[in-house]
Structure formats: structure tokens, C-alpha cells
Swiss-Prot record:
Gene name of the record: hisC
Domain of life: Bacteria
GO terms (BP aspect): L-histidine biosynthetic process
PANTHER family attached to this UniProt entry: HISTIDINOL-PHOSPHATE AMINOTRANSFERASE, HISTIDINOL-PHOSPHATE AMINOTRANSFERASE 2
InterPro entries: Aminotrans_II_pyridoxalP_BS, Aminotransferase_I/II_large, HisP_aminotrans, HistidinolP_aminotransfase, PyrdxlP-dep_Trfase, PyrdxlP-dep_Trfase_major, PyrdxlP-dep_Trfase_small
Name of the protein in question: Histidinol-phosphate aminotransferase
């Protein structure tokens, strides 16, 4: 700790991201990345973008990308906001729509960046306790004084909340913003985007990191009625007008446009997820129903931390959370079929020795 730090810097507990190993031989199932490369059209766009106009600033409004996303979701360009990954979009959204004197609500088991944002911006928040099966009780989100944040599908559980439940939360908080974080929506859930026209308090946040294989380029976006997007732009332009560079913008456009490749990759992930769930069930694991590109697993006989350590020793990384209620669970990202076959083989050998 330095005497030059501000009080906020001294007090804040930063988010801890998943391990990014340098060893390329490690099977990486800990950060929910896509096991398949970006679309070939994306890679070609990146090559084509490497030219002398990189000396110029990019379009601060990302107009072409916004129009591409708007067309994809049948929205107007004015209903799309672009940011440097969905983490930045979420952070700016917390600052744009939530007030320090009004308590916001999000689940006790959810994306662990939410309390970091709340503490950074001095926001009061209430943790809505998930049920024993990790499902959401929507009554806990009723009449939230400051607004609400829903992760759908939830992370790290993978559970999906129906659109009817989302509608109820929106109606119960009609005078406050409800953010729906849909980072994993493309792996089996139904997006809330269709509700935007009817709910001026709905902000849907998505990313190209997961289903579009662009985690390395940091592209996220928010979708909502234009008054919400105008507010986000006011805050963004008080920090950094140029959040997306030229190359990332062009890559994102091609990723959105290549629907055939997108569907092919997401279908492979879903099929591999279902295969993995079946194989783990054969050896006694309990798996929370998942609509994401990861699964949340536990075993009545073996400790999650022990399995986590043994897998790491075998060069397989998964995510372990040493937290209340989930300390005996592992979150396992869905890799390629070949990677998951190795994972299953390793975990069988490990539990046979424990």
C-alpha cells in the first residue's frame, strides 16, 4: 500500500480474473473462452485492416459496427452502444444508471465483478440469495430501489431465467433500469432483446468474447431504447471517446455477419456440453442444468478443491471458487470434443485415486 493512493484505491477489492497460463500445453477450461477460432472472414478483415490509416483515430461512434449489430437484432443504430468488452459496458452502465443513495439488487452467486463496480462507485447493494438449487426467486428483485442486474444465463451456475420471469422483474421495477447481462445467451437461451421495444427500463448487455471467439479483441455492446444509450454515451465520452480501435471494429463486423460460422461453432459447443454432462453423470457428478458454454459440477464423495488441484497437476485448468455455498463446485468451460475427452479421462483417473 502506498501513501499516494486515494482512499478508494486503498479500500477497493479488485476483481480476480481466471488464470491465463503461459504454458500452451495446458488444457484451458477455466475462463469460458470459445475452443474454436474466429471466423475466417474475421481473420481476413484483420489482415486487410493493417494499413496506413491506422495512424488515424477510429470512429468514436463505431457507426458501421452499431448499424451491423442493429440490423442483426432488428433495432435502430441509436439503440446500440459499443464498449471495450462487456466488462467496460457493465462498468459504465453501473455509473450511468445507478445512484449511491439507492440500493441495487443482484444475486449472491453471480458475476463477481458486480460488487467490485458497486464498491468502486460507492453504490449500496443487496444480494438476492439464490435458492438451494441455485435458481432465482424473482420476488427478491421486486421494487428494487436503485435497479437490478440479472446474469442470464447465470454465471457460474449456467442456469437460464425465462423471458416471462425477466418481464416480471422489468414490470416490478418499471421506474428503474434492469440490466440483463447476456454474455452466454447464444449457447441455448432466448435473448431479452425482443423485450426492448416494450420496456424502456431494459438494458441488454452482450459480448463477442464467447460465442463469436473474440475474447482477445475486447468488444462488448449494450442494447436498449435510445434514451438509455444516450446516457451511456454521455458517461463514455467523459472517460474515453475512442473505446474501440479500427481493427477490432472491422473484426466485429465480420463476426456478426458470418452467421453460418457462428451457428456451426455454437452447435458444436452445445453438443460437446451435452456429451460432457452425460459422461460426468456416469461417474457420479451432479451437474447444474446449463445454457452456457460451461457447466457447474459437484460430487458427493470428492472435494472440489482436491479435484481442482489434481487436474491442475495434470495440466487441465478449471475454475474453483473458494466461496460460501459454492466451495464444493467446479466450473468447467466447454472445450473442443478432443479437450473434453482428455478432461473426462483425467477426472476419472483422479477420482479413482482419491
Amino acid at each position: 500500500m502506498s501513501k499516494y493512493w486515494s482512499n478508494i484505491t486503498k479500500d477497493i477489492e479488485p476483481y480476480v480474473c481466471g488464470e491465463q497460463p503461459k504454458n500452451k500445453k495446458i488444457i484451458k477450461l477455466n475462463t469460458n473462452e470459445n475452443p474454436y477460432p474466429p471466423s475466417p472472414k474475421v481473420l481476413q478483415a484483420i489482415k486487410n485492416a493493417a494499413k496506413d490509416d491506422l495512424r488515424l483515430y477510429p470512429d468514436p461512434n463505431c457507426d458501421v459496427l452499431r448499424k451491423t449489430i442493429a440490423n442483426y437484432y432488428n433495432l435502430s443504430k441509436e439503440e446500440v452502444f459499443i464498449g471495450n468488452g462487456s466488462d467496460e459496458v457493465l462498468s459504465l452502465s453501473f455509473l450511468t444508471f445507478f445512484n449511491p443513495e439507492e440500493t441495487i439488487v443482484f444475486s449472491d452467486i453471480s458475476y463477481s465483478f458486480y460488487p467490485v463496480y458497486a464498491n468502486l462507485y460507492k453504490l449500496d447493494y443487496k444480494l438476492a440469495k439464490l435458492r438451494e438449487d441455485f435458481s432465482i426467486d424473482i420476488e427478491d428483485f421486486k421494487n428494487a430501489r436503485g435497479g437490478a442486474v440479472i446474469t442470464n444465463p447465470n454465471a457460474p451456475t449456467g442456469l437460464y431465467l425465462s423471458l416471462d420471469s425477466i418481464k416480471q422483474i422489468l414490470e416490478d421495477n418499471i421506474n428503474k433500469v434492469v440490466m440483463v447481462d447476456e454474455a452466454y445467451i447464444d449457447f441455448g437461451g432466448e435473448s431479452s432483446v425482443s423485450l426492448i421495444k416494450d420496456y424502456p427500463n431494459l438494458l441488454v448487455i452482450q459480448t463477442l468474447s464467447k460465442s463469436r471467439s473474440l475474447a482477445g479483441m475486447r468488444i462488448g455492446f449494450a442494447l436498449g431504447q435510445k434514451e438509455l444509450i444516450e446516457g451511456l454515451n454521455r458517461i463514455k465520452n467523459s472517460f474515453n471517446s475512442y473505446t474501440i480501435d479500427r481493427i477490432s471494429s472491422l473484426a466485429a463486423i465480420e463476426a456478426i455477419k458470418d452467421e453460418e460460422y457462428f451457428k456451426e461453432c455454437t452447435l458444436k459447443v452445445i453438443k460437446t456440453r451435452n456429451w460432457t454432462i452425460n459422461e460426468l453423470g456416469k461417474i457420479g457428478f451432479k451437474i447444474i442444468p446449463s445454457k452456457a458454454n460451461f457447466i457447474f459440477i459437484t460430487h458427493d464423495t470428492y472435494e472440489a478443491e482436491d479435484i481442482f488441484i489434481k487436474l491442475r497437476d495434470e495440466n487441465v485448468l478449471v475454475r474453483y471458487f473458494n466461496k460460501d455455498r459454492i466451495s464444493n463446485y467446479l466450473r468447467v468451460s466447454i472445450g473442443s470434443k478432443e479437450e473434453m475427452e482428455i478432461f473426462i479421462d483425467k477426472i476419472k483417473k483422479i477420482i479413482n485415486k482419491l
